[in-house]
Amino acid sequence: MKLAIIYGEVSTKHQLIMERAEEIFDSVLAVPIDGLKFLHGEEEQKVLYKDIDLTEYDAVYIRTDDRDMMFAEHLVEALNEEGVVTQASNDTYSYESNKFYSMKVLAENGINVPDSVYTLSPDVAVSAAKELGYPVIMKTVKGVGGEGVMRASSESELKPVMDTMKSFQQEICLQEFKEHGGTDTRVIVIGDEVMAYSRSSDDDWRSNISGGGERVEAQLTEKMKETARRAAGVTGFDICGCDVIESEGEPFILEINGSFGISKEMNQIIGQDVVLRIVERMHERALQKKRNS
């Protein structure tokens, strides 16, 4: 069985995945996403890295960032059409590449998300913020790990940021701020399996790790588990991380990330080898597909 791991930037995360994958798969190939090209003919299509055709692989695990989302959309579609196992459906990266779009899709499927507004106009944003009520969360529609996420407590804080975002041609997404006690939970969905850790910060309302949050053991409710599973299913992810908060007694999804952070520290807190479970899941699906073909 052959697995390719596609990555946007070299990091210890990909090295950890490679180590675990080599324990399970017969052959493992690391592929930089900027080294790929598509070849479309009348009767065939190929996804090439040098002279290697990834459509001949059993499984491909894709980890990318927001800069490569459009490329990832075409990539996962080409691989899925050729029968290669991936962790995403054809439409998944169109959802992940736009935070407002993903929230819209989740809401349309009955999943709790903060009320959101999407606009190109700073003036419209100011008016919308009054309707949402301060404080409001300001987001660029792209970005992961807390990038491009700010909070405004008043119009005087909001307007300059909106003007700056407009000058840099950034699309604007506003969200209502949900009180959650400074803690959110990263729920990792791998098939039907759910595992999690919480992230807490006393000094920053953004509790994500890159924003200064600390990983702590999570207390998952059944509602949170089911909400994360449904969110993954709606957006087409077989493997993903869902950022979940509890507010007003209900779980709310803040974001879905296919390239969520992984580390040995995370494994220790959760009490499971998450990376190994990711690789095992890819292997299980590839093996089942081969048996059925």
Show the residue positions of the predicted features.
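Protein kinase-like catalytic core scaffold
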Residues: 136, 173, 195-196, 240, ...
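ATP-binding N-terminal substructure of ATP-dependent carboxylate-amine bond-forming enzymes
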Residues: 1-87
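Phosphate-binding site of ATP-dependent enzymes
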Residues: 150-235
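Active-site nucleotide/adenylate-binding loops and adjacent lid/helix of ATP-dependent enzymes
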Residues: 1-8, 14-19, 54-55, 79-83, ...
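Glycine-rich phosphate/pyrophosphate-binding beta-alpha loops
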Residues: 66, 257-269
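A long amphipathic alpha-helix within ATP-dependent nucleotide-binding catalytic cores
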Residues: 168, 206-253, 274-292
